[in-house]
Amino acid sequence: MHVPPTDPARSAPPASPHRRRRPKALGLTALAAAMLMAVPTTQAAFGSDVRPAAAQEVVGGGDLGPNVLVFDPSTPDIQGKVDEVFRKQESNQFGTDRYALMFKPGTYNDINAQIGFYTSIAGLGLNPDDTTFNGDVTVDAGWFDGNATQNFWRSAENLALNPVNGTNRWAVSQAAPFRRMHVKGGLNLAPDGYGWASGGYIADSKIDGEVGPYSQQQWYTRDSSVGGWGNGVWNMTFSGVEGAPAQSFPEPPYTTLETTPVSREKPFLYLDGDDYKVFVPAKRTNARGTSWGNGTPEGESLPLDQFYVVKPGATAETINAAVDQGLHLLFTPGVYHVDQPIEIDRANTVALGLGLATIIPDNGVTALKVGDVDGVKVAGLLVDAGPVNSETLVEVGSDGASGDHAANPTSLQDVFVRIGGAGPGKATTSIVVNSNDTIIDHTWVWRADHGEGVGWETNRADYGVHVKGDNVLATGLFVEHFNKYDVQWSGENGKTIFYQNEKAYDAPDQAAIQNGDIKGYAAYKVDDSVTTHEGWGMGSYCYFNVNPDIRQQHGFQAPVKPGVKFHDLLVVSLGGKGQYEHVINDIGDPTSGDTTIPSQVVSFP
């Protein structure tokens, strides 16, 4: 899934598909005892490992557990502690360790925080400029020989950076959001050596200098400000970005919307004096630029004692009891097995994960169910399918939901789904959205193509995302490798701004993917009954490495109606491993050969 950037003078990685090599296994080291000096926060007494029975009152507030490391400028040996986490997590792609590195407001000098798997770094101010690094927050790809295409599951948030050499490096692929950041310099999105990279997502951020994507295949930037944008490979999409390049797809491949129709930034933890709170930003319509650039952002602050602070070992029964009592949910870093769905049926509930908190459904249950109510905010969670097939992993609203939530929509933000990779996993449909007006803001829904428990039937997952509600908006939709439809859209007036897809690598033959008389299931299917739908900046790639003779009829399928519109579509055959015959329906040139050159459609119909 990789080609050189458009300017070979700046970098020249070879053209070749991605994620074909397994990473080298590196031994895990124990965290140094000195790291424990970064003491987890304490507030009201919570802290017992013994969880209350569901019939008992669930207590809100408390400490944030051992995997949230909180620093202030006087903490000794900050660099050493951060480095120790990185050594543990640099190549720990399918491990169970989770960390959140939290920095109290202040100035930190000579810091280079390298961020590995399942690690989140964040400032604890209300605004990014409250917490300043004279230094860098870095993601590179030394662990994988300069290939950044497996730099998944990590995040940076709510910090200001003065990069040491003037440019910060954030060389990531999917599920690695860069939110609410102020880079007082440039931002390099490619690894050292300009190897392959497959990102990515920026939101609510200000980059004073130029952003250099270099070898990045695609990228989505929302409601931000940039000092310039260097290049594009296949698909660079912007909505509500000050300083974004002008609309010019296909050459250069820039898709630019002046504003984002509806957005609401992700909730985040911060310090108000000595008290921990969660800030819940307000919804914005037709947003452009950051939410914080003009001072205090609009939104609501919730004290920590209104949250059940969920720690590893907590049961779904207790989590649900907390919601029933009126508490919000703050998942501390860890892995949580649930034997029944986590159910959020109360309007305006916040469920926020720290450090890529991970939920695994046992015995085929659904991991998370959100009711058809107003304003639920779910953010910062990884749902990892279990070995017994789940019909669904995440549901928003029940089937047939009909409520009007336009004034106060439910949102899924940085909610990631994985089927296989860490071990056997199966799910029929990963995410089902029944509620009207839902916002899906940055998700990576991934049927694993490498790791443990991977095979056409071993990690069977027919459908990625199925949208049934009306007026649903997806901003930054990454869905890959499903056995049938990656995205199916049945609701009216849906919108998608940026879509990245790969079809499943491991189809054994043409018959395995045949969809009636259609060769292969579309990567993005709009049902024939739909009359209004619109999408911008959308790409699908194929790499049928098991059987390169497979033909995919099209990447996109939609009814030909005046209200169904697409802008800036592309399909790519990665190294000639399989081919597309068209881009959308029977429109668009076929891909051919092994040159990894996209076939594009600028507008549909």
UniProtKB/Swiss-Prot annotation:
Thermal behavior of activity: Optimum temperature is 50 degrees Celsius. Maintains 70% or more of the maximal activity from 35 to 65 degrees Celsius.
Q: Which residues participate directly in catalysis?
A: 502 (proton donor)
Q: List the disulfide bonds.
A: none
The UniProt record lists the keyword Secreted: yes
Q: Which parts of the chain span the membrane according to its record?
A: none
**Protein EC:** 3.2.1.58
Name it.
Exo-beta-1,3-glucanase
